């Protein structure tokens, strides 16, 4: 019988669930749909979590789950939302086949912890709830927390408004290629890359594609990869878009760093999300400015798997 914990990362695009042993080793992994309560309904959230958890345990029957931690996008610091999500997880775990995997005396109030997704990303990178995490994926947010409980958040307003996000990079790219086409009738190298990805024949088709009902926010945000590729090939417009994104993200990081007291020991900065982990121009600009201008930041860590932070927190709530 393996004694384990469940770590869950419920985002706006997908849900990831991992099963880990007492030493943090991941022995099972599952995935489901989005779990952000601001974007999908309660039944959809339950379905996503149920699918992800079932994928983890179905091939590992000899289990004893000691604790669960879920980092959920859209929950924030709201105790009401956290409690609602805890209830959903308990509804899943308290029915077969899940219930048979829980340790005797499992208490949902004590053994199921729900936090914001920013918290698990911070812990995954820094190893504790002390430091700053900057996340840039479809949306963006910067969050700081100290061991004394001081907490500061900048951004996280939603993908329509978040600066330095994948969606914002994609939106700026679309404006750039449409403006160039209006002024000169030119299909720029960046425009051609977008047309290829979206399988369009002309820049004239771009606006219709953007506003059709089947186009998702992630379709726009994923253009950040195209902008990064174009910038790497020397496209100046793409480079400028990425510089602007880096500047906006750094401003948010700086705002948090200057409002929070990390003491003499300072803190780590954790960089997470597809833009910060995969777009080198953005990351390198931020890293350089942080090292020069923010002495409270003693180290910079990349976080590619926030769910590992959920495992760390679950282990703290377990008897392992």
Per-region residue spans from a language model:
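ATP-binding/phosphotransfer module of carbohydrate and carboxylate kinases, centering on a glycine-rich
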Residues: 1-67, 79, 105, 124-132, ...
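Long C-terminal interaction/binding lobes of large macromolecular proteins
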Residues: 70
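Short loop/turn segments at strand-loop or loop-helix junctions that form parts
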Residues: 73
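Phosphate-binding/catalytic loop of phosphoryl-transfer enzymes
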Residues: 76-187
């Amino acid at each position: 019988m393996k004694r384990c914990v469940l770590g869950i990362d419920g985002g706006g695009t997908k849900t990831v669930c991992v099963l880990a042993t007492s030493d943090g080793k991941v022995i099972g992994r599952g995935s489901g749909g989005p779990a952000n309560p601001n974007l999908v309904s309660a039944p959809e959230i339950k379905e996503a979590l149920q699918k992800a958890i079932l994928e983890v345990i179905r091939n590992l029957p000899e289990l004893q789950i000691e604790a669960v931690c879920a980092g959920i996008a859209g929950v924030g610091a709201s105790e009401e939302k956290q409690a609602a999500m805890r209830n959903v997880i308990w509804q899943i775990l308290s029915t077969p086949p899940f219930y048979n995997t829980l340790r005797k005396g499992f208490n949902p109030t004590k053994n199921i912890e729900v936090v914001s997704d920013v918290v698990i990303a911070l812990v995954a990178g820094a190893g504790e709830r002390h430091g700053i995490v900057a996340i840039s994926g479809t949306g963006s947010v910067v969050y700081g927390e100290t061991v004394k409980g001081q907490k500061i958040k900048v951004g996280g307003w939603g993908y329509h408004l978040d600066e330095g996000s994948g969606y914002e990079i994609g939106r700026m790219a679309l404006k750039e290629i449409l403006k160039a086409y209006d002024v000169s009738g030119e299909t720029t190298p960046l425009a051609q890359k977008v047309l290829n990805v979206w399988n369009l024949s002309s820049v004239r088709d771009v606006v219709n594609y953007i506003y059709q009902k089947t186009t998702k926010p992630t379709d726009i945000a994923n253009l950040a990869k195209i902008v990064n590729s174009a910038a790497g090939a020397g496209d100046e417009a793409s480079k400028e878009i990425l510089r602007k994104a880096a500047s906006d993200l750094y401003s948010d990081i700086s705002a948090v760093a200057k409002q929070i007291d990390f003491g003499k020991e300072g803190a780590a900065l954790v960089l997470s999300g597809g833009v910060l982990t995969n777009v080198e121009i953005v990351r390198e600009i931020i890293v350089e400015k942080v090292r020069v201008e923010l002495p409270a930041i003693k180290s910079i860590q990349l976080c590619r798997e926030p769910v590992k932070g959920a495992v760390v927190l679950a282990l703290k709530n377990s008897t392992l």
